[in-house]
A protein has these predicted regions:
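Active-site-proximal, Lys/Arg-enriched surface segment
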Residues: 1-64, 74
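An internal, acidic/charged active-site-proximal segment
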Residues: 70-172
Length: 172
């Protein structure tokens, strides 16, 4: 269907698998099955009009254990330069490629699996794109330019503090 691009959709698709010989197969969440099981997962970026969507980037996700297994990589012919990247890192790479290719822009739409990643949201903003992201209820989001107070100074005893602090002027 014709019409202007309204959104760039980041999502992943899982493919249930029996056995462990296909590239990237691991016990991980499989959306098709609604539970953890052996599957492959691909991260995609699709462009959407009001009536239709079309995937423009698609990349197989390699779980960390699989990406680090030299024997499996060699058997499958996975090039050395391919290293582990999280799903949000793959998504941000795809968005950067779409911007570099001059694809028609739209707001980036992502579910909580991607939207909860601060670096992804920040990267999308740095590219001058707006986004609509699902986030977990316990995630603090700060207005642009507003920052939390830093953790308390370390007293020299115990573990160094790492929790951010809030006060009247520092609120998410």
């Amino acid at each position: 269907k014709h019409g202007p691009i309204e959104a760039w959709i980041i999502d992943d698709t899982s493919f249930p698998k029996k056995g462990r010989h296909s590239v990237g197969v691991a016990r991980q969440y499989c959306g098709q099955l609604g539970k953890q099981d052996n599957c492959q997962v691909a991260v995609s970026l699709s462009l959407a009009t009001h009536a239709a969507s079309l995937p423009v980037f698609y990349r197989l996700y390699l779980p960390d254990d699989w990406a680090a297994d030299r024997v499996c990589r060699r058997k499958a012919g996975v090039p050395e330069e391919i290293t582990f990247q999280s799903k949000p890192e793959i998504a941000l790479d795809q968005i950067r490629q779409a911007v570099a290719a001059g694809l028609p822009r739209g707001s980036v739409v992502m579910d909580v699996g991607y939207g909860n990643d601060t670096q992804l949201r920040a990267g999308v903003s740095q590219l001058g794109l707006s986004y609509l992201a699902g986030i977990q209820a316990n995630t603090s989001v700060w207005a642009q330019g507003a920052l939390p107070r830093p953790p308390k100074a370390w007293s020299g005893r115990g573990r160094p503090p790492k929790l951010i602090r809030r006060d009247e002027q520092h609120q998410p």
